[in-house]
Amino acid sequence: MKYLGTQTLETKRLILRKIKLNDYKDAFKNWCNSENVDKYVIWTKHPTEEETKILYTKWIEEYDEKTYRWIIELKDINEVIGTIDVSKRFLNFGTCEIGYCLSDKYWNQGIMTEATNEVIRFLFEECDADTICAQFLENNPASGKVMEKVGMKYEGRLRSRIFDKDNNRNDLLVYSILKEEYFNNKK
């Protein structure tokens, strides 16, 4: 795998780019403090803008050639509405595990599918990844629909794998797409 780091990517409606510190205000307003988003993520919503600012400062400092972390900016309004990133956990094996988060104001508009498609294209075509995978809590089937729309296939269920905010164990559902599947789907 070629390590190119977070490059600016563009789609019809979106700009995917590195996080800038001043993004924290939109992030806090649009998803980091959202009750609706909080239902479907494993982290706890941020009580203050300062918490989001601290996190973004840390993330900005972590950027290197093996960091793939994009802010999702909606072109029409020049506002950040979400994030999409790659865990470093399996990068040395050519496997990219992606995760994403989107403001609930933009759910069900195809935005996350558009962003994920572009990141998958970048990882396979420019970084030469072998496999791209993703996981989601079973209470978030919309995330699984995004994975299916971008060509990922259901791999299985990681039973009782993670605790939710109420300290209950939850299953994670796993999807992936292989390099050869991606290129075959493009034909």
Where are these regions (language model features)?
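A short hydrophobic/aromatic micro-motif that marks alpha-helical segments and, especially, helix-coil
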Residues: 48-50, 63, 166
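Acyl-donor (CoA/ACP) binding surface of acyl/acetyltransferases
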Residues: 1-26, 30-36, 73-187
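Hydrophobic residues in alpha-helical segments
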Residues: 31-32, 41, 60-63
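Conserved GNAT-fold acetyl-CoA-binding loop/helix
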Residues: 36-58
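A short helix-loop-beta-strand connector motif used in the catalytic cores of GNAT acetyltransferases and
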Residues: 57-71
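Short, conserved alpha-helical segments within structured domains
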Residues: 44-48, 68, 139
